[in-house]
Swiss-Prot record:
Similarity section: Belongs to the villin/gelsolin family.
Knockout or disruption consequences: Half of the homozygous mice die during embryogenesis, the other 50% do not show any noticeable abnormality in development, growth or behavior and are fertile.
Gene: Avil
Biological source species: Mus musculus (Mouse)
Protein name: Advillin
Annotated binding of a 1,2-diacyl-sn-glycero-3-phospho-(1D-myo-inositol-4,5-bisphosphate), by residue: 109-116, 135-143
Residue span(s) of domain HP: 753-819
Length: 819
């Protein structure tokens, strides 16, 4: 087959395309068989999707555990050719059975099914309406599940997992007593998917609860007729999951191939920065041996790029890692989100739009805040999400300070003044369609005591409970104030480096104070106290120098008119409007004297603006076992927010922790520490003071919902639980009748070959005067139809037919010419 014909199915339309290696050629796998993989084969999977206005393509070559070396090499070659066909931009992945990446598993929401055999043993991917099946599937996992064909025996069972006995027209689900509701729900959805996609919706499904087998005697009879007498079930087997701490260790290597010898040189360890990557070279990034990335620079030769995967495999062998280690190769300029998140900061130069710009004291780079239309925030939650704003900050505000570990109200005239030695709670109330919504900010000063920090979190829980868990809780570390927090104080937010505002404990005002003022409107302006020295100045900002006798408002050359106007409003607040304006370069000598003398400061021309290139990511978090486990959910939708889970949405400049209504008490209580541990163990070396927002199911603000396409507030009230889906299956009567009929069919077995004695429909439709085969009972012609022909003729299964009244059966047989 020519490459042009093999890749004819490829387009820019968002979809999944799967090929199987058959006799060293590519063969398309039908859509109905997607997610089914034969253990003796190799596959190539192409994912095409749109991320904003950009096209994202990923090529995965999958290796079955029983596939041959020739098939594996062939799959690797076709992967390279497909990459070339698509212009070299896709991310390439090497996937090994049982060790697939979260990205790969995420494509198959209903789960992956491993099937025995392969091309060499004549196994084909069949189309819909095939009933000649007899297999036992071992289902593992809760979110991205995998189902493996195992021996048809009770010895295959264990108490912690779910098993599906698939008999073609009947699927029986057996739930291990120690399996959880999430696993049972996913297994049931897989059973329904098999029924609908492979059996045309005609198979019957039954469920046995492993700890209540006596409640399903009919279904247990079917299991024992098929598997033999029930034996003792094995104990549960724990899933091998790499915890977040293990994944946090990363190492970057430079790769060269001198005289045919692989040479790797250690470059750096965590935290990594983007500048370490030279565009003319190739690099390997080793994530604790759990995953290997190969980065191919734009200037690397074609030969070097094509050899990237083989270099990775050589590296794995050299390090003594398992051959199943996941490998991902990325191209310079088209890196995956998984790769970029391993770096402390990944930015794209010369862009003026995107997620959070960079600001830091003493450096020239600064934030450019754009104006936005407040009216869009609730009608278009995606705008609220991008702007990090639920409204314009004009709601009701209450402020408390932690004093002697208790909450003390802060008088209105002191709203907006925050001291680094204190902790505060700020409750913000706003209305949406006449219904109150709440945000509870927990502001923690840099110099607050450990007891005060703990008390602020504890008191926040108390306030939250007063409102029945409705408030969104936001932890704010000093200096990391979110935009909406600043908007609450309408451009009059002042942050003192230390001290306290408690009555009787106020410290005397120092003789000289310097405030850095940045922001260009009332939604993003604050004054932050910095060290009173010339080195603190920045040409792109406005500074207020305040003494007991005189005040100076210093305008940096790079500050804008809007920034200067907002600074004047803060002068009114801090100095009663009495401050001399000083332009950079025209400072009087006393200005420098007050700052301890003139010294160098950040006064170069404005740095090239950078836009952080980040992708919003969703994770399932768990610490039930004492280990912090994080599982990424790729291509996420609202349906991935399960009521029984705690989910983490990472937008890089802030982290949302979503708590499902059915999450266990331990995880609810440890929500904040869960988010903090995520930041601390993040392989890129994330800022541990990143704002954390704790959100409860049913109280999601638009800043959260805007990251999900077509958010539906009624999805959980309308969605069906495991028990509801189970009840829809009805009783086991039809299954018992079908299996009884299947047993009766053994009366028509050919003793010589053990195969059912079925006849083609046209043979059985012969008239009374035409001879039928000797062993066919003319009154029971339907018994000689294969399962597939039976459904084709009658439109119902054999079990459903048997359940009908005798007169109805006779009528149907007459109508179809079988009587």
């Amino acid at each position: 087959m020519s490459l042009s014909s093999a890749f004819r199915a490829v387009s820019n339309d968002p979809r999944i395309i799967t090929w199987r290696i058959e006799k060293m050629e590519l063969a398309l796998v039908p859509l109905s068989a997607h997610g089914n993989f034969y253990e003796g084969d190799c596959y190539i999977v192409l994912s095409t999707r749109r991320v904003g206005s950009l096209l994202s393509q990923n090529i995965h070559f999958w290796i079955g555990k029983d596939s041959s070396q020739d098939e594996q090499s062939c799959a690797a070659i076709y992967t390279t050719q497909l990459d070339d066909y698509l212009g070299g931009s896709p991310v390439q992945h090497r996937e090994v059975q049982y060790h697939e990446s979260d990205t790969f598993r995420g494509y198959f929401k209903q789960g992956i099914i491993y099937k025995k055999g392969g091309v060499a043993s004549g196994m084909k991917h069949v189309e819909t309406n095939t009933y000649d099946v007899k297999r036992l599937l071992h289902v593992k996992g809760k979110r991205n599940i995998q189902a493996t064909e195992v021996e048809m025996s009770w010895d295959s069972f264990n108490r912690g997992d779910v098993f599906l006995l698939d008999l073609g027209m009947v699927i029986i689900q057996w739930n291990g007593p120690e399996s959880n509701s999430g696993e049972r729900l996913k297994a049931m959805l897989l059973a329904k998917d098999i029924r609908d996609r492979e059996r045309g919706g005609r198979a019957e499904i039954g469920v046995i609860e492993g700890d209540k087998e006596a409640a399903s005697p009919g279904l247990m009879t079917v299991l024992q007729d098929t598997l033999g007498r029930r034996s003792m079930i094995k104990p549960a087997v724990s899933d091998e999951i790499m915890d977040q701490q293990q994944k946090s260790s990363i190492m970057l290597y430079h790769v060269s191939d001198t005289a045919g010898q692989l040479s790797v040189t250690e470059v750096a360890t965590r935290p990594l920065v983007q500048d370490l990557l030279n565009h003319d070279d190739c690099y390997i990034l080793d994530q604790s041996g759990t995953k290997i990335y190969v980065w191919k620079g734009k200037g690397a030769t074609k030969v070097e790029k094509q050899a990237a995967m083989s270099k990775a495999l050589d590296f794995i062998k050299m390090k003594g890692y398992p051959s199943s280690t996941n490998v991902e190769t990325v191209n310079d300029g088209a890196e995956s989100a998984m790769f970029k998140q391993l770096f402390q900061k990944w930015s794209v130069k010369d862009q003026t739009t995107g997620l959070g710009k960079i600001f830091s004291t003493g450096k020239i780079a600064k934030i450019f805040q754009d104006k936005f239309d407040v009216s869009l925030l609730h009608t278009k939650p995606e705008v609220a999400a991008q702007e990090r704003m639920v409204d314009d900050g004009k709601g009701q505000v209450e402020v408390w300070r932690i004093e002697n570990l208790e909450l003390v109200p802060v008088e209105y005239q002191w709203h907006g003044f925050f001291y680094g030695g204190d902790c505060y709670l700020v409750l913000y109330t706003y209305d949406v369609n006449g219904k109150p919504h709440y945000i509870l900010y927990i502001w923690q000063g840099r110099h607050a005591s450990r007891d005060e920090l703990a008390a602020s979190a504890y008191r926040a829980v108390e306030v939250d409970q007063q409102f029945d868990g409705a408030p969104v809780q936001v932890r704010v570390s000093m200096g990391k104030e979110p935009r909406h927090f600043m908007a609450i104080f309408k451009g009059k937010l002042v942050i003192y480096e230390g001290g306290t505002s408690r009555k009787g404990n106020e410290e005397p005002d120092p003789p000289v104070r310097l405030f850095q003022i940045h922001g260009n409107d009332k939604s993003n302006t604050k004054a932050v106290e910095v060290s009173a020295s010339a080195s603190s100045l920045n040409s792109n900002d406005v500074f207020l120098l305040r003494t007991q006798a005189e005040h100076y408002l210093w305008y940096g050359k790079g500050s804008s008119g809007d920034e200067r106007a907002m600074a004047k409003e803060l002068v009114d607040l801090l100095c009663d409007g009495n401050a001399d304006t000083v332009a950079e370069g025209q400072e009087p000598p006393e200005f420098w004297d007050l700052l301890g003398g003139k010294t160098a400061y950040a006064n170069d021309k404005r740095l090239q603006q950078e836009t952080l290139d980040v992708q919003v990511r969703l994770f399932e978090c768990s610490n039930k076992t004492g280990r912090f486990l994080v599982t990424e959910v790729t291509d996420f939708t609202q349906e991935d927010l399960s009521p029984g889970d705690v989910m983490l949405l990472d937008t890089w400049d802030q982290v949302f922790l979503w708590i499902g209504a059915e999450a266990n008490a331990t995880e609810k209580k440890g929500a904040l520490s869960t988010a903090q541990e995520y930041l601390v163990t993040h392989p890129s070396g994330r800022d541990p003071d990143t704002p954390i927002l704790i959100i409860k199911q049913g109280f999601e603000p638009p800043t959260f919902t805007g990251w999900f396409l077509a958010w539906d507030p009624h999805i959980w009230s309308e969605g069906k639980s495991y028990e509801q889906l189970k009840n829809e299956l009805g009783d086991a009567t039809a299954i018992v009748r079908i299996t009884a009929d299947m047993k009766n069919a053994t009366l028509y077995l050919n003793p010589s070959d053990g195969e059912p004695k079925y006849y083609p429909v046209e043979v059985l439709l012969k008239g009374q005067n035409q001879e039928l085969p000797e062993d066919v009972d003319p009154a029971k012609k339907e018994n000689y139809l294969s399962e597939q022909d039976f459904v084709s003729v009658f439109g119902i299964t054999r079990g459903q037919f048997t359940a009908l009244p005798g007169w109805k059966q006779l009528q149907l047989k007459k109508e179809r010419g079988l009587f």
